[in-house]
Design a protein with these regions (language model features):
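Surface-exposed beta-loop-beta
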Residues: 163-173
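A short hydrophobic/aromatic micro-motif that marks alpha-helical segments and, especially, helix-coil
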Residues: 12-15, 78-79, 165
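Outer membrane beta-barrel
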Residues: 19-162
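Cleavable N-terminal export/targeting peptides
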Residues: 1-21
Length: 173
């Protein structure tokens, strides 16, 4: 019995040495958009700090190219006073990446907004024109596929219901 116990302890030590340290598969998503303003001259007493919008979420890699992502969008609505905030589910999606191809399904980010935001790149100065003038929604219910041919050329296609993430269709038709 003692010999069996010693052999078991030795084999556990060997397994512990061979075990790889597993990297974290998930990551938190935290983005906060705010403004600070102050007046000059006659408007010098006009100062303010404002939290426009926050994104809180989590992304987890399941393995074999599969990942899931969920993001809450919290911000103010034009329908209520400035002190109230509303929360929406912006993303609830599953993705599969194989080589240079990516498939997304669920409540996904729309591809035209990703392209425009990367092109503009100065969200801290001003919203991009699609967001400013409400040319579509930044997320919607549907599927998308993207393929990267090279670093300088990609193609994508998206099929969505067109209602955005704030007005999810609840019934048929």
């Amino acid at each position: 019995i003692i010999l069996a116990g010693i052999l078991a302890c030795m084999s556990m030590g060997a397994q512990a040495q061979n075990a790889k340290v597993e990297e974290p598969k998930g990551k938190a998503i935290v983005q906060v958009f705010g403004n600070f303003s102050t007046g000059f001259g006659a408007e010098n007493s006009s100062r303010g700090f404002e939290l426009e919008r926050s994104y809180l979420g989590y992304e987890y890699k399941l393995g074999n190219g599969l990942s899931v992502k969920s993001v809450l969008d919290m911000g103010k609505s034009s329908d209520v006073s400035d002190n109230n905030r509303l929360a929406y589910v912006k993303n609830a999606m599953i993705s599969w990446k194989k080589g240079n191809m990516t498939l997304n399904g669920g409540l996904i980010s729309t591809t035209q907004f990703n392209f425009q935001e990367k092109f503009w790149g100065y969200r801290y100065i001003m919203k991009d024109f699609q967001d400013m003038y409400k040319f579509g929604s930044s997320a919607d219910l549907g599927i998308s596929v993207a393929y990267k041919f090279a670093d300088w050329i990609t193609a994508d296609a998206i099929i969505v219901n067109g209602e955005g993430y704030k007005k999810i269709q609840k019934n048929d038709g």
